[in-house]
């Protein structure tokens, strides 16, 4: 059966994957302007794609001149036994990536969450603060691509250290934070403020797979890339790993490499149809492939296919 599966995903129109709206360019400029007020930078990224899609521009414009912590969030969605390999590979690629934490912002007792502030404080105290040496409070900037959990991290840290809720707006749609916000107090002693920032992608995504991996974990908005394309890439990844849990989920008889077959079967399994206007003005009833694609994508994002490190092929 595996011989029938694709071994390479076909190249798609790069325009579908290059999403850099105006607020991202403006946000990057605002972040650079606020750097003089910042003592430490925390970069948040999705643990499922630790080697894909990080904005390398941050290193040259934001994080390269300040103490830096890389937080790999949503660690509950990957096998914890792989964390060591992820760290080793990241440090092979970037000698500056010395401080890496894995977090789950939905769990306040998470060991990584507990380590964030002590580590940041240690890095700040051991650094040369230059123009901020006489400042008693600490200011930490939170950066990253869209929808990796930056605002969630701020909220869980604020709730943990101040026991207050409602620090920063959180949403499941990429790009909800659009401006560099005012300082958000998250600790009284020591006095610590965080700066939330908009998720910012590179203006040009490196390649098809990088873009689709970002899309699969919601760093790109689904409708801009196309739900059926994202579902097709998911099918490709699952087949490549021999993960056939989608067969039962989508009402199939056996694994397949055809996304059309998956979505038609899925819409029938879900009993979902859509009325489509025919060329002669009449309406015909067809399987709702879009809804089936959304169902399949949501199943992945909620863990129905198990814990998956999407970048596992980069460790070979």
From Swiss-Prot:
Source species of the chain: Aedes aegypti (Yellowfever mosquito)
UniProt main location, coarse: mitochondrion
Protein family: Belongs to the TRAFAC class YlqF/YawG GTPase family. MTG1 subfamily.
Keyword Transit peptide part of the UniProt annotation: yes
Gene Ontology biological process terms from the UniProt entry: mitochondrial translation
Protein name in the entry: Mitochondrial GTPase 1
Residues annotated to bind GTP: 73-76, 147-152, 199
Function noted in UniProt: Plays a role in the regulation of the mitochondrial ribosome assembly and of translational activity. Displays mitochondrial GTPase activity.
Cellular component annotations (GO), alphabetically ordered: mitochondrial inner membrane
Keywords for the protein's UniProt record, in alphabetical order: GTP-binding, Membrane, Mitochondrion, Mitochondrion inner membrane, Nucleotide-binding, Transit peptide
Topological type in the membrane: Peripheral membrane protein
Single GO molecular function: GTP binding
SUPFAM superfamilies for the chain: P-loop containing nucleoside triphosphate hydrolases (SSF52540)
Localisation per UniProt entry: Mitochondrion inner membrane
Domain of life: Eukaryota
Record keyword Cytoplasm present: no
Residues in CP-type G domain copies: 28-203
